[in-house]
Curated annotation (Swiss-Prot):
Provenance organism: Rattus norvegicus
Signal peptide annotation: 1-29
Any one GO biological process: positive regulation of protein phosphorylation
Any one GO CC term of the record: mitochondrial membrane
Region (Disordered): 400-442, 459-1108, 1120-1227, 1330-1401
Protein name: Fibronectin type III domain-containing protein 1
Amino acid sequence: MAPEARASPRLLLRAALLLLAALLPVASSAGPPVDHPLKPRHVKLLSANMGLKVTWDPPKDATSRPVEHYNIAYGKSLKSLKSIKVNAETHSFLIKDVEKEVPNKPLRMRVRASDDRLSVAWKAPRLSGAKSPRRSRGFLLGYGESGRKMNYVPLTRDERSHEIKKLASESVYVVSLQSTNSQGQSQPVYRAALTKRKNAEEDELDVPEDISVRVMSSQSVLVAWVDPLVEKQKRVVASRQYTVRYREKGESARWDYKQVSNRRALVDSLIPDTVYEFAVRISQGERDGKWSASVFQRTPESAPTTAPENLRVWPVNGKPTVVTVSWDALPESEGKVKEYILSYAPALKPFGAKSLTFSGHTTSALVDGLQPGERYLFKIRATNRRGQGPHSKAFIVAIPTTSSTEASVQPNGRDNGKPEKPQQPSSSAPKVAASSQHMPPAKNVKDALSDLKNKIQTNGVAPGRTQLHSKVGELDPQSTEVTGEEELDSLENPRSSRLETLNQKQPLRVPSRSGHGALAPGRTPARAGLPVLSRKEGMDRRGPSLDPHPHPRVEPSASSAYHQLSSTDNDSVDRKEDDQAGSPDPKAASSGSSPKNPGRSRPTSAPSRHAASNMLRDKSRVHPGTKAASSSTSRQSHSSTSEEDSSAQPSRHFPLHRGSSTSPLSRGWKDRQDTHASSSHTTSRTASSSHPSALTEGSEEEDGGADSDRAAEDTIRRAEATAQIQQTRPGLGHFSLIRNKPFTPHSRNPNRFPRLRGPRLQPSVSPQSTSASKVLTRSPSLPASHTRPGSDVYGDGEDEEPLPATVINDRTPSYPRHPISGSSDTLRRGPQRGASLYRKEPIPENSKAAGADVPPGGRSPLSSKAQGFQQSTTDEGAPQTSPASTSRQPSPARPPASRSQPSPGSTVPRRMTPDRSSELSSSQSKDRSLSQPKLSVAHAGHDHPHTANSRGVLPSAPQNQNEGAQSTYEDNSTEIEGPDSRTPTHSARAKDTTPPILKPRQVGSQSWSSDNRPQPSQAGASERPIRPGSTHPRAQVPGRAGVQATSVKKVSPSKRPLPLESQQSVFAEEEEENEGMLKGKEDSLSTSVKKWPSSSSPRDKYADRNLDKDKAAIGLLVQEENTVPGRRPPGSPAIASHPSTRHQPRNPATASPIANTHSWPRYTTRAPSSYSSTTPMLSLRQRMQRRFRTPVSRQPPPPRPVLTPGYNGRPNAEENIPPGSIGKPNGQRIINGPQGTKWVVDLDRGLVLNAEGRYLQDSHGNPLRVRLGGDGRTIVDLGGTPMVSPDGLPLFGQGRHGKPVASAQDKPILSLGGKPLVGLEVVRTTTQVPTTTMPPSTTTTTVPPTTTLPPTTTTTRRTTTTRRTTTTRRPTTTTRATRRTTTTTTTPEPTTPSPTCPPGTLEHRDEAGNLIMGSNGIPECYPEEDDFSGLEIDTALPTEEDYVVYDDDYGLETTRPPTSTMPSTTAATPKVVPEQGTVSSFPEEEFDLAGKRRFVAPYVTYLSKDPAAPCSLTDALDHFQVESLDELIPNDLTKNDLPPQHAPRNITVVAMEGCHSFVIVDWNKAIPGDVVTGYLVYSASYEDFIRNKWSTQTSSVTHLPIENLKPNTRYYFKVQAKNPHGYGPVSPSVSFVTESDNPLLVVRPPGGEPIWIPFAFKHDPGYTDCHGRQYVKRTWYKKFVGVVLCNSLRYKIYLSDNLKDTFYSIGDSWGRGEDHCQFVDSHLDGRTGPQSYVEALPTIQGYYRQYRQEPVSFGHIGFGTPYYYVGWYECGVSIPGKW
C-alpha cells in the first residue's frame, strides 16, 4: 500500500482532500444540540492491493457525543463524489473501485504438459503498476478439455506460475489466463496442451514374489524378494519403494514396518527363538501395492542376552565363611536356561575368581569357604544350550571377620601352607567340604568343580585345554572328564563327604594336589577343577602329610585357596572352558577332587588307582580347584601351593600344568619360608604320589595316542604298584597325570586318561616309595610309563604339581630337605613362572637352589645356572623332598628338574644324573620316536636335580627349543605342583628360568606335544616325556619354584601376567596339540614353544622380567649345554645344545628342555627349534612359527625341513607325527587355515584356534563357536553352518572379515595417526631381546636374540621377537604405533630378517638350515604341500608379539605368539616382506607408470605392492584392522543423549601404488566420551567439490574404501561421526590426487602367455551395483575369473559353463558386495550366502572342492555328503600360478 501511495501522489492527495471534507461523523440526537460536527482525527489515505484504504481515529469528544456512523465521500473531483456510510465501530475502510480501466492481459504464457498435469507460467501485464489506471489486482486461470466447461482458479497478483494436477492422460486441454482488477478482467490468453500417455505404473502395482527370509543371527533376518517389474527386465523405477512388515506369529501381535529402496531388508532387534510373520508390498509415488502372502520364519535360539537380575548376597548367621546368594530367574524369552554360573572373587584379588554352576531351576545357593574380613564381588550369568549370557552387575559383600583360622586359611593358599599340614587340610577341607555339605552332593561336587574351574580360568589355564580334556573324558572312559563326571555322579555324595572328610583329614595334601591340579588345568582345567584339587590336596598332604595324614583331604580348601591364587590366572580360562564344557566339567572337577580324596584315604591299590584316575581326570579339571586345595594344604603344601599357584597360572596357557604350577608357586613363594620344612614334606609326599601319575600322564600325552597310552599303562602299572605302596599317594600320581594331560593333546584323548588313571596311581605310589632316582631308573625301563610320571611331573606335571610330589619322594632318598625347601620356594614361584619375570628374580634363588640341587643331583650337565636352578629347586624343595633327584623319579624330583630346566636352560641338564640323563635320553629318543618322547626327557630328568633339569631340558632339546620352552613352562607348572609333593627347588629354578615364557609356552607345547608326543616334555609335551623318564622334567617346576622363591615378592605380579600367558599358552597348547597331531610332533612342539616365549616374553613387565629370567635360563642352558653337550639329555644348555640337541634328539631331550627354557626366556623360538632334533615336533613348530607370524598356522608342514639339521633351527631328527597320531582326535581337529597356515578346531571348547592358541572371532569379536556336524565329521557353527569340511578344510570366508580380528597373515597392519591396534594379533614394532641374565647362581649367559645358539645347537631360528602385545595385556600393551609393521622373516641369519617365500610355498634351506637364495637374492621356494606353508617363515614378528585373548571366559592374557623362527635376529624391527607389502608415508616409486609424480602429503600413506600383481582392494584392506563391534558400538547408548561432539581426527588417505581406482580413507576413533555408532564419509571430485556436491558412504569402522576413482584426478574427503542422537561436526576435508592409469593392465610376459584375457560380461543390477570387465586366467580350476568391478580387481571363481552368462555379485553374509573371493555356491545358483541349517541342504549335483587350491570337482553335495556346498576361495591370498 505504501508503495502504491507513493506511486500516485496526485491521485491520493486529491482523493485525500476530498475524503477529508467528506468524512463527517453523524452525532446522535441525544443530548444538548451541538452546532459543529464531530471531526475524526488522524485521517489517513493509503494505497492497498485492491484499492485505497482510509483509516482514522474517533473524535475527541466521542465519549460525550457518541458517534452513530461515519460518511466517506470520495471521487476524482468534488463534482463526482460517491459516499459510503460506515458504522461507528469501524476505523478503516477499503475503497476498491478506484481503478480507471480493466488491466492489460498477461504476457508470455507457457504451458507444459506431463502425463497427468499441466504447468502454466506467465509474465505480468504491461502497465500494471500502482500508478497505472490499468493495474492488475490478480489473475484468473481457467482450464478444461476442449469443447467442455472450463474450470477457473483465482490467483493472486504476485503469482507467475501454477500447476494443474489430476488431469486425464492423452487429452487436449485449453488453458486461459486473465488479469483482474476492480474494473473487471482483461482479455484472456489461450493455450492448448496435450497431456502425455500414462505409464504402465498407472496399472495396479505388482505384488512381490519369491519372498525369502534368511536367518542372519538369533535377532536378525534378511528378507529378500523379487520385484516382477524388475524381473521382467523392464527399467528400474527410481521412485519404487518397498515396505516389509513383520510381527510375532499371532493375530493380536502388532505389525512393525521397515521401508527400503532395494529388494532386501535386514530386520533386526527380533526376539530369539520366536516365529515371525513377514510380508512385503511395493510402493511408488503415492500409491501402495498389495501385501504379499506372509512368510513365517523362526529365529534361532541364542545365548541369553541379559543377565539374571536382582543378584543378592548376604551372610549366613553363625557361619562367617558362608553366604547365601539369590537371583531372579531369567525370563523365558531368553530361552530355556541350562545353568547359572555364579562367579565370585575377592575384591582385591580379581584373579582369584571362582565360579559355581547351578541348574537352570536354581535361584539361590550357599557359597562356602570365603575368607573372613575379605570383600567379595559376586556376578552371575545364565547359559542355555546356545551359550553363555552376559555377567550381571557385580554385587559386593564383606565377609565378617572371624577368629577362625580355618576361614582365613582356606582362601589363602599360603596361610594354609604355613599351618601344620593337617591344620591346613582341615582348613581346606572345610572349604571344600563345606561347599559339598552345603550343597547337594552333586551340586557340591559341581560347585567345587566349578570353583576349581573358575580358579583355573582365573589362573590363566586355557579353557580350551581343560575343555578338551573334559570332553575327551566324556568321550573316553579313560579321559579325565568322563571319569570325573562318572565319579562325580557316582561319588557325588560319597565323594563330597569323602572330600570333606579327607579334606579335614588331609588338608595339607590338598595343596600339593592342588598344585598338581593347577598344572592339570592346562590340560583339562575345567575337569581338573575340583577333583584335581582333591587329588592334589591328597598328593600334597600325602607328600609331607601323606605319611602323617593321608586323609587330610580337607586340603581341598587349601586347594581352593590355591585355586584362588592360581585362579586369578587359571580360573577365568578354566571357567570359560568349564562354561563351555557345561556343568559336567564342574561336576567332573568336583567329582575328581572327591575321588582324589577317596583315593588318598583308600589304602587299597585299586581304590588308589581309581582315585588316581579320578584325580587324574579331576586334576586336569580341578586345576583351579587344585589351587584351592593347595591353599588349604597350606604349606605342606606351601611350596606345593606356590607351585600349584604357578601351575595354575600356567594352566591358563596349559590348562593343568600351568595352572597347577602357578598356584603352587605363588603359594610357595608366599609361604615360602614357612613351607621350607613343610614343603619338603609336601614335596616328598607329593612327589611319590604325584610323580607316578605325572609320569603316566606325561608319557601318555607325550607319546601321542599310542605312546601316551603305552606310557600311561606302564605308568599305571608302576603307579599301581606304587599305589599299593602309597595308597594315598595315588591321588597325587593321578593328579600329576592330569597335569600332563593338559599339556599333551593325548592327555586330552580319552584313551590317555584311563591309562593315566592307572599309571598315575601307581606312579604316585612308586615315586613315593622310591626315590627320584628309582623312578628315573624306572623311567628308562618304562619309557612311556616312566616318562609319564617324569613327564607327568615334567610336562603335565609341571602344571600338575604331582611331579613335585614325586620330588617329595625323591627328597626322601637323596635331596636335602633344604633343597626341597627351595623347591617349595620354587613352587611358590611357580605361579610366577607363568610370568616369566619371576623367573628372573628367582634366578638368584635358583642359582642358590641350583647349586644345592646340582650338588645333590650331581648333575653337572646343567650349567652352573642350571645347577643353581636345580639346587634352588632342591633347596627350596628340600624340606619337601629332600631327595630331589629321587624325587625326580617321583613327581617331586621331577618338578625340581622341571623348574630347573625352565629356569636356566641349564635346567635341561638339570637333575638328570648322567645315567639318568642317558636313561632319559634313551627313553626320550624312544619316546620321541613314539611320541616325541616325553619319556626321554623325563628319564633325563628323573634321577637328580640334574636329571630334573635334564628332564626339563630334555623335552626341549629333542623336540625343539620352542617346545623346550614350552616344556619349561610346563615343567614350571609341574614343578610348581612338584614343590608341593616334591622339591620346589627345581620348580623355582625352572620357573626362574622359564616362568614367563615357559608357562605360556608349556601349554602350547603340551598341546603340540600331543602332536609330537615325544616333545611334550620339551615344550610342555616335552615336559611330560621328561616326567615319565624321571621327575626331573618336573624338576623344572621346582626350578620355577626356585625362581619363585627367589622372587617371592615378585610372585604376585608374575602371577598376574602368568594368567594371561597361561591362557595364551593354553590356547597355543591346544592348538599346537591339534596341529601337532596333524603336522607332526615336532612341528607342533615348535609352534607351541615359540608361542610360549612370545606369550611370556617381555611383552609385559612381568613377561619382560620373565624374559630376562628366561634369557638367563637360556644362558644357563647354553652354558650347561656347552659344559655337557654330550650329556644334553641330563642338562645340556637349551640354546647351546639346541643344535647338538638336534643331532642328539633323544639324548639332548634333557638339554633340549633347558634350551627351551632359555630360548623361551630369550624369546628365541629358534632355540627350541634346535631342540628339534631331540624334539622334532618342536622344531617343526618352530619352523612353522618362523614361517608364520602365528606359529599355529605354521604347524602344518613338519615333514619337509624337519630332517635338515639347520633348517630353521630344527634338528635333522625332527620327526613328524602323522596326522593320525593326533593327541585328541575327538577333541581337536587341525585344518588348513588361510595362506597355508594350520588352524585347530577345538571341539571341547567349541573354538577355532590358530597356532598361537587364539580363537577365531565372529563379526562381534566374540569367539566363533563351533560343534560337530550331523555326519560326525563336519564342523559347523552353532547355527549349523558348516565351518570345516570332513577333510579339515575351512568353509568360512578367508577375506578380511573371515579371519580373526587381527592383521592379515603377512601384511603389516596400518596404525594411522597413532591409532592403537587391537585384535588377536597386535604387532609390536620393537622386539625385545629374549636374552636375560638368569638370576640363579649359575652364570647366566645372556644370549641376545640376534646371537645364534652355540654352534653345537642348531641356530635358534628366532626372528626378532617383536611382540605383538595386545591391548589387554596389562604389563605392556604395545600398540602397533608404527605405520609400517614389518614382520621379520625367520631366516637362519640372526640379525637380519630375511625375505620370505610367497604364501603357499616354502623356502629351501641347506643342511645348515640357511635359506638357499636364488641369483636374484630371493629365496628359493618349493610348493607348500610339503611341510609348511611359506607363510610360516614370513613373519617372525607376530610370532613374538603378544596376543590378547578377547573372550571374557578365557583369561584376558596377552599371549605372545611363538617367537619367530629367526635364529637370533636382532630384536628387531620386523621387516615387511615385499609380498606382504610395505606401508609408508612416501611411495616407493616417486613417479607413477605414466611418469607423473605421485601425490605426497602428511596425511597420505602408500601401500606398496608387487608391480606385477594386479590392484586388489581386498589385499589393501588386509592392512586394516577389523574392529569388533564391542569396540565400535558402546554398550550403553543411554548414558549420553547428545550427538557426537567432536569431528573424527587424523584423517589419512591410504593409496596403493600403481592403483588409481581406489583409496582407503582412515581416521581415528572419536574422542573418549563421544558415543559414536558409525561414520559418514564424504567424497567429491574437484568439480563436485567446487559445486559442493558430495557423495556419502557410511562406515561402522574407522576406515572406508572409496572406489571408482578416475585416474589423475583430485578428490576431497571428509568424515563425520554419528550416533542415534544425531550427527557430529564434519572434519576438515583432505585432498588427494590419484595417479595415472596403468596402460599395461593386460600384458604379455616374455614367455608370451597371456596373463589375462579380458572380455565383457553381463551383470544383473539386482545382484550387484558394480559392472565392468572380467579377466580370465588359465588355471587348474574349471574357470578362474578375475573380475574388475568398480575399477578394482577382485577375484572370483566362476563356475558357469558360459563365461558370458550373467554375473551375480559374490555375496557376503548380507547377500551383496563383491568383496569376498569364493566359489559360487552351487545350492544358490550363484547367489552365495550362509545357510541357516546345514540339515536343510538337499543333496544335489554341484561343484565342490576338497582342498585349498585344488581343482573344483563336480558331484553330490549337500547334507549327508562330505561337502555341504562349495567353500570359499581365500581372498587376498595370491592366486596359484604366476600373475
